[in-house]
Amino acid sequence: MADPASNVLRLHDTHLRDKRPFTPLDPENVRVYFCGPTVYDRAHLGNLRAMMCADILIRLLRTMYPRVTYVRNVTDVDDKINARAKENGEDISALTERTTQAFHEDLASLFILPPDIEPRATHHIDDMLEMIGRLVENGHAYVAEGHVLFAVRNFPSYGELSGRSLDDMIAGARVEVAPYKRDPGDFVLWKPSEPDLPGWDSPYGRGRPGWHIECSAMSHRYLGESFDIHGGGDDLLFPHHENERAQSMCCYPHGKFATHWVHNGMLLSNGEKMSKSLGNFFTIREVLDRSPAEPLRLLYLGAHYRSTLDFSWEKLEEARRVLDRLYRALERGNAQPGTALPAAVMDALCDDLNTPLAIAALHPLADAAMQGDQDAASSLLAAGKLLGLFNVTPAEWFQSGVDASAIEKLIEERLAARKSRDFARADAIRAQLAADGITLEDGPGGTTWRKA
């Protein structure tokens, strides 16, 4: 069995483009920041990828270190939010509250751990303005026509995180460059806001923050100038994370900002990029309306976080069948809580969160548990809990998604038929239930049922 304290976690660092041992700045308090949602619509399966990556990382870190401070922001001021509220004829605050609550409900349904701190951008405007003021003062930002822009040429390592050359980025740009920019690569820290849109008074006039400064200000507010891990989807690597790193390191030159960068791969649907026009675009809620949560969770765990994950309904059904077998093993082996984690599972997760290998390590335990090995069943339970699985009892799992009252009524009818020696009717009821995937088990205490 594994001793979590003796394991060494090796994580791929996007910045160094290599897998390396994770060494926290303070082993007594590991500090982690993940970019959260922009709350203008229901979260979709692609959004879920980063949240699952963060969840497994946080679960693992909490088995290895005494304290983990996990911060995940909510972006509640954004042009997409403004446009959607106008399209809906809805108040902006009503839209952001509704979609934030829906986001929380979706993640809770999937047993994803909440962050310790969940700052909202609109609650940290003063923190953003303080950073912007420092950047203007030290020459890394400038004011132009009511905008404040970051001067990328003044930060020599700009592009280092994403592996891009600034000159190549500018040469490849096809968008029209705003005339007030000194350099085409300069990005907005603050911009003017129209009277009918959210805005705050500032030394630069009434306006609102740019996207990138929001995360820099909130991570600094709760985690300081240096923290351990910054994560998110690889679609955020450039420009968002590149710009975060630049403005934070220029604002606080004695800090390291994030010492380790973790990025997850993207999601396909039936082998193609999700698109409403292709009919393969699904929100989390749409999937959970058709399936229990744990199969979706297992499907995500079945792909390494840095690889591309391909969603399909067939794969979701296969994940459900796998869970049927694992839950059956827990039941047969009479799994008990409190067992140490299996070494094979810890070793897999400590190797860059290798969840496919961790899932593979569950199957030998399930094989033994199916033969009545209680130790194996208990180890299986402990491993599954670390992975965020086995959130219900086997009895609850096998009775989910069926009409329990209708089954109980048929069992009572069968009992009455047997008492009246109408064995043909009793056998017909058993056969009817078996055809629906329900197995009856007669014992001294009466008849119980389970999904086959």
Swiss-Prot record:
Its cofactor is Zn(2+). One of its GO terms (biological process) is cysteinyl-tRNA aminoacylation. A motif ('HIGH' region) lies at residues 37-47. InterPro entries: Cys-tRNA-ligase (IPR015803), Cys-tRNA-synt_Ia_DALR (IPR015273), Cys-tRNA/MSH_ligase (IPR024909), CysS_C (IPR056411), Rossmann-like_a/b/a_fold (IPR014729), tRNA-synt_1_cat_dom (IPR032678), tRNAsynth_Ia_anticodon-bd (IPR009080). A motif ('KMSKS' region) lies at residues 273-277. GO terms for molecular function: ATP binding; cysteine-tRNA ligase activity; zinc ion binding. The keyword Phosphoprotein does not apply. It is an enzyme of class 6 (ligase). Keywords: Aminoacyl-tRNA synthetase, ATP-binding, Cytoplasm, Ligase, Metal-binding, Nucleotide-binding, Protein biosynthesis, Zinc. It holds the Pfam family DALR_2. Its EC number is 6.1.1.16. This is Cysteine--tRNA ligase. It comes from Gluconobacter oxydans (strain 621H) (Gluconobacter suboxydans). The lineage of its organism: Bacteria, Pseudomonadati, Pseudomonadota, Alphaproteobacteria, Acetobacterales.
